[in-house]
A protein has these predicted regions:
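Sec/Tat signal peptide C-region and signal peptidase I cleavage site
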Residues: 31-36
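Acidic/histidine-rich, surface-exposed loop or edge segments in extracytoplasmic proteins
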Residues: 64-96, 122-132
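Mid-length scaffold segments of soluble, non-membrane domains
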Residues: 98-162
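Hydrophobic/aromatic-rich core segments of domains that either
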Residues: 151-215
């Protein structure tokens, strides 16, 4: 994905400060300090880099328009929470089942926000070359949105087999690999990392879920 934003790991110093800034933002948003402090510097930087609050148990900022140039607040209703709880209940039996449930939860999010944002018109692998930012996510938007949704599911106690991991980056210009980012889940038992990548998929299509080791080799 092509855009002007730096890689997530571009500056170690910046991510350290971003982690502190993310805690401050969360505190101002009313998130308990203990929860805010649990954000890693890499996750906190997703939010501080575009001056938005991390998600709370009741709301999240939804980014679109490429690098979060457009944004909308999703206030979770009782119906939203019930729908996501039912979706995730199907994944309690195993880690693989939970990853499949997460795919359905991301599709739920896509359907929930599509008509509100206009992203029900979005295309797969969108970037600035499509000249339609108002209807699309770039990979920075999908990384932020998916990470936020996963953090909410985690806060609600709906992730039994996984924890939310640090976002991952790929992009090897020597082999013409396009720069790209994604959200990540970490298996609590095996510590294996799994990407949850919505950007390569169109509206209402399930996100890619695969081991990070495989994802970093794709384009």
């Amino acid at each position: 994905m092509l855009d002007a934003a730096p890689p997530i790991w571009a500056s170690r110093t910046r991510t350290i400060f971003a982690g502190l800034f993310g805690v401050v933002l969360a505190a101002l948003a009313g998130v308990p300090a203990a929860k805010a402090a649990e954000l890693s510097s890499a996750v906190a930087y997703l939010y501080s880099s575009v001056s938005i609050y991390p998600p709370s148990a009741s709301a999240m900022t939804v980014c679109y328009g490429f690098v979060c140039r457009r944004r909308e607040i999703l206030d979770f209703s009782a119906g939203d929470r019930n729908a996501l709880t039912q979706i995730m209940a199907a994944g309690r039996a195993s880690a693989a089942a939970e990853r499949a449930a997460v795919q359905k939860a991301v599709v739920w999010f896509d359907r929930r926000m599509g008509p509100i944002l206009g992203t029900n018109k979005r295309v797969a692998k969108a970037d600035f070359r499509y000249f339609d930012d108002k209807h699309n996510f770039d990979c920075w938007d999908t990384t932020r949105n998916t990470t936020s949704l996963l953090l909410v599911l985690q806060e609600w106690g709906l992730l039994k087999h996984h924890a939310v991991g640090d976002p991952k980056y790929r992009g090897n210009t020597l082999v013409l690999q396009t720069p790209h980012n994604t959200a990540v889940l970490v298996d609590r038992v095996t510590k294996a990392e799994w990407v949850v990548d919505l950007w390569p998929r169109g509206y209402l299509q399930p996100p890619d879920v695969m081991p990070v080791e495989k994802w970093v080799k794709e384009d």
